[in-house]
Amino acid sequence: MSRVFVTGGTGVIGSALVTRLLERGDDVVGLARSDSAAETLEARGVRVVRGEGYDEDDLTRGMEGCAQAYNVAGVNALCVDDPRPMERMNVGGAVAAVRAAARAGVARLVHTSSAATIGEPPGTVGTELTPHRGWYLSTYERTKTEGERAALATSREVGQDLVLVNPSSVQGPGRAGGTGRILLAVLDGRLRFFVPTCVSLVDIDDCVAGHLLAAERGVAGERYLLTGMTLAIGDALALAAEVAGVQRKPRLLPRRVATVAAAVVERGFKIAGRRPPVCREMVRTLLHGHRYDGSRAERDLGLRYTDPRETIRKTVDWARAEGLIR
């Protein structure tokens, strides 16, 4: 049994990762910034260290005595007015984790980056070697990209073994936000309009397996895209409706209409002093779409991806059991 440190252990990816680590008998240490997070982790048998995911000293305390560490914590949001919390966690937290791992003597740190950092040009398929397009779709993409680059530079500076994993949109039990929220809204009949786009997805179990395989077989300083499928949004939603046994087919809005509508909604909500449910950044990201190639993780790590139908079936079964859809 080895001791392993995890940040973000109550999130979708982190919680599933903690489950796998506990199942294989690891002594898991988790960072918790709140009482509720600490209680959740302790109830699962995780040793808890209180602190912030961007504080190097807090992270060092948690990593002491650990052979491996997984820095999963991050902030993923759109339509935010103040980028500083995202910068502090996604950039500052990435650097702090690398420095803490070096101070604590961690043999390998796996950092959860994002497929968004690939920055593929419009209409192209992104790989780990794709040159970034040079401009950002969102604050999230910018901060995760800056965090990834800073983490790599810091790892070279301090001599820390670091492997990056870059999941695309994670789907499966527990995912009720982001694209998971869109899927559930369509299946429940609450979302009747959408935009034409493509989406790359990865099953939550495959995402966790990719993290574990990166720790075991990954090459230091390299990154591995974790993405098992790319679907046009119409095909993805049709498959979801078929699996769920419902008749759902959202109308796809013209790109121009979607862009103008987002600008109007964003301005109206900001005038009212409220956070908009839709904004230009969100629509810009959706209209760009994402197409990623996750075959390197298959070749180099031995990862095997789940069939899309099975991923959606698990998601639908979980959502129904939780009362999220009818």
Name the predicted role of every residue range.
Residues L191-V195, V199, D206, R255-D300, ...:
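A hydrophobic C-terminal alpha-helical subdomain
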Residues G210-P277, G294, P308-R326:
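Mid/C-terminal beta-alpha module of Rossmann-like enzyme folds, strongest
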Residues S36-E42, V46-G92, A100:
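NAD(P)H-binding glycine-rich loop region in Rossmannoid oxidoreductase-like domains
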Residues A96, G178, V195-A215, G221-E222:
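Substrate-positioning beta->alpha
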Residues V158-L201:
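NAD(P)-dependent short-chain dehydrogenase/reductase
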Residues L137-V163:
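Active-site Tyr-X1-5-Lys
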Residues M89-Y140:
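Conserved Rossmann-fold NAD(P)-dependent oxidoreductase catalytic core, especially the SDR/UDP-sugar
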Residues V4-R24:
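N-terminal Rossmann NAD(P)H-binding glycine-rich loop of SDR-like oxidoreductase domains
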